[in-house]
Amino acid sequence: MKHLPQLEGVSVGLEGEAVSLFWGEIKEEERQEIYECAKALVPWRKGPFWVGDFLIDSEWVSAKKYALLEPHFDLCNKDVADIGCNNGYYMFRMWGQKPKSLTGFDPSPLCRTQFDFINHFIQAPIRFELLGVEHLEGYGKLFDVIFCLGVLYHRSDPIQTLKSLYKGLAKGGELLLDTLMIEGEEEVALTPKDRYAKMSNVYFIPTFKALSHWLHRAGFERVEKLEIAKTGLDEQRKTEWINSQSLEDFLDPCSHDRTIEGYPAPRRIYVKAYKGA
C-alpha cells in the first residue's frame, strides 16, 4: 500500500453498478503496481470496482442488493453506520447521498486493507473501525441510520446482536437489515446441525414472523418487510478475483432449490426497523 502511486485528477463514479475510479494516462509501471496490489488482496467478496482500466469483478454483484435497498433510505445530512461493512463498497455508494458522517465497522484486516486500497484514490471522508457489532453500544456515538447486511445469521445470539444495533441508534433511528430466512408462517428458525451452504458459522435462519419477534424483543417499535429475494448465480459466483468456492458449489448439484446439506437454498429477507422517538 505504501508504494501505491499518488495520482492527480482522479474522477469517481458512484452511479453505476461499479464504484469507478478513472484517471488520465499513467506510466505502465504505475498501472502494474496498482493491479498487482489489487490482486494481492484477493478474495474480493463485495464490489465490483473499476480501477482505471481493469475491473475488480468481485464474488458478489453487490449492486443488486444496493439497488433493492436504495429506494428505502435517505442518508442526506445523517450519521450513518454500516455494520459488517466488508471492503466498503456499500459505503462508497452511500457517500453519494452526502451523509453527515459515514462509519464502517468490520473486524477483518483484509477488508480494511481493501477499503484503504480503494480509498487511496477516492479520498472519501469515511471512518473504518476494526470493530464488530458487539462494540457498537460502547462506541460513544449514536447513528441516525444503521445498515446490518449479511451479519445476523453469523451471530450465535441474534437477539443480543439486535439489542446492540438498537442501542447504537439515536431516537427515531432506522435499521436496514437483511438476513437469510426460511418460508413459513410459524414463529420458528432453522438451526443447521453443522453447516449451511458449507458455512460452519450460520446459527439461526428465521421466518419473517420469528425475525419480527426478535426485533420486538430487542426494543424496536415497528418492523417493515421490504423484499424477499432468492440468491441466484447471477449475484454470487466464482470470478478470477476470489480464490475459493462460491454459490454453485454450495448448492445441491441435482437441485439448486437446496443446499449441499439438503436445507432450503439461500433466500434473503430485507427489513426496515424503527426505534421510537
Swiss-Prot record:
Enzyme class: transferase
The organism's place on the tree of life at top rank: Bacteria
Keywords for this protein: Transferase, tRNA processing
GO MF annotations in UniProt: transferase activity, transferring alkyl or aryl (other than methyl) groups
Keyword Plastid: no
A Pfam family the protein falls into: Methyltransf_9
One of the GO BP terms on file: tRNA wobble uridine modification
InterPro entries linked to this entry: CmoB, Mo5U34_MeTrfas-like, SAM-dependent_MTases_sf
Disulfide bond entries: none
Annotated residues for binding of carboxy-S-adenosyl-L-methionine: K46, W60, K65, G84, D106, P107, S108, V133, E134, Y153, R268
Function: Catalyzes carboxymethyl transfer from carboxy-S-adenosyl-L-methionine (Cx-SAM) to 5-hydroxyuridine (ho5U) to form 5-carboxymethoxyuridine (cmo5U) at position 34 in tRNAs.
Family statement drawn from the similarity comment of this UniProt entry: Belongs to the class I-like SAM-binding methyltransferase superfamily. CmoB family.
Protein name: tRNA U34 carboxymethyltransferase
